Amino acid sequence: MQIIEIREPGQAESKQEVKIAVGIDFGTTNSLIAISVGRKVKIIQTEDNKELIPTTIEFTNNNITVGSNKGLRSIKRLFGKTLNEILNTPALFSLVKDYIDLQSQEVKLNFANKQMRIAEIAAEVFIYLKQQAEKELTTEVTQAVITVPAHFNDAARGQVMLAARLAGLEVLRLIAEPTAAAYAYGLNKNQTGCYLVYDLGGGTFDVSILNITEGVFQVIATSGDNMLGGDDIDKIIADYFCNKFSLLDNLDTLRLAKKAKEALLNQDNFEFNNISLDKQTFEQLITPIIGRTINIAKECLEIAGNPNIDGIILVGGVTHITLIKEELYKAFKVNILSDIDPDKAIVYGAALQAENLTTPNIDSLLIDVVPLSLGMELYGGIVEKIIMRNTPIPISVVKEFTTYADNQTGIQFHILQGEREMVADCRTLARFELKGLPPMKAGSIRAEVTFSIDADGILSVSAYEKISNTSHIVEVKPDYGIDTSEVDKVLENAYKNAKLDHAARLLQETVIEAESLIFNIEHAIKELVDLLSENEKHIISSLLNNIKHAIDARDRALINNAVKDFKSKTKKSLNTKINIVISDLLKGKNINQIK
């Protein structure tokens, strides 16, 4: 919202302070920084005229150097990761094996003659980008819009924001990388419709489905594979060279493969020291990889409800390969948008959004989505989903829960992430307790729970109880990050176990209802002890034992039959007496009562 300063008549107009806002693409391999003025984007160059700045940090001669292609690489992959996760993931451990402090309880690297956290090291990249922008623009740069992968969770996003703040940058907004690319095309081309963003980088593949309508960008589905990218193409070519020309499987061959890949972007043949590769063979080699990306894109469309797409936006340097455009067109028969250099599309969108947030009367809005469902634990270990996967953000959802036991003075809240039905199969995000509640009958206390996700994708959960005026709020920062492959694994397990999960949930709900019936009947019998004959007590006890045995057998049909048998055999002779007491006990209770 624009703030307008109101002055007294005749008061001199002071010169407005100008704050420079830039867009930053903090990439795994390379980073870029750009500024937009009048919706015209300019990418900031280094002193040696480079736009793509290697995301590397090196410490030599008591100085930290960024962009030297040496030292610590791919630090972006470490955002949001725990020490255990890094140690147990070879691909991550190999990045930091020469730096990591194994004695620490958290992720710390021995770097620059001291222990540094990931955010502190990443801040050096932001500092370097900021300095390059200030040199070229000859003014201080204080604000930025920064892009992050669509699947970055709260912990990873939080570390990006911390790194930027340590570099002296105010983060105006974090936006998903595919959203940024779509934003660049939406404003530059004035597009409206539904678009598929195809982002194939060096080591990862991301695909998103976006609606773009009247300046509103909404991600409606995301998918991808974080182990698929240009590096795989290099490996396939290297293997071909090893088999065809008896080369050694080493780094030199891999570099030669990369050189061949880049050469074949603009020519039909590659030759080097009697090693050759023609474009036709090259395309035959990489067709399986391109096919995998297209299958993932089709699956993402299914998740989105199979909308008709109006175009495909290309992102990532690998999409310079002509065959990718051709195969995408064959598969989807829509326009391929590649007017903006795929290497630069993301930073273009970030720069345009930075201008949008600092310039009056630009009304475009970006909306990302929740990658995995968020919910709470209910009584019995059941998961109640509060915000569903692929829900657009920002979002706020309010639900009411109640106590399940008499004289309960606290409610425990267990916040979860995942698509499964039971707590044991989902990821714990946070736990907290609302204490100091007045001791009252079960169901009398009502707690209002609010799940809120802001525009940066940060989740906060609050609980409020009106009678005691007690409240608690927690900003959820998961213990470890979640990337594309983990999201895909969660979804795959959810689909694979859908029937079993549904059956498990129905069984648990049936058990809870049966246990509630047993509790209330036994409580009622104590109140009716003088009204019931010994024969009636025996019948009730026997029927309740049948229900208990069925519960122990974990057989839903058996439980339902035992409950049905109890109700039918006690309906006429006992219903009136029992209802005198249990009608009050059951008031306000339902299956969704939580711990």
From Swiss-Prot:
GO terms for molecular function: ATP binding; ATP-dependent protein folding chaperone. Keywords: ATP-binding, Chaperone, Nucleotide-binding. Belongs to the heat shock protein 70 family. It holds the Pfam family HSP70. This is Chaperone protein HscA homolog. It comes from Rickettsia bellii (strain RML369-C). InterPro entries: ATPase_NBD, Heat_shock_70_CS, HSP70_C_sf, HSP70_peptide-bd_sf, Hsp_70_fam. Chaperone involved in the maturation of iron-sulfur cluster-containing proteins. Has a low intrinsic ATPase activity which is markedly stimulated by HscB.
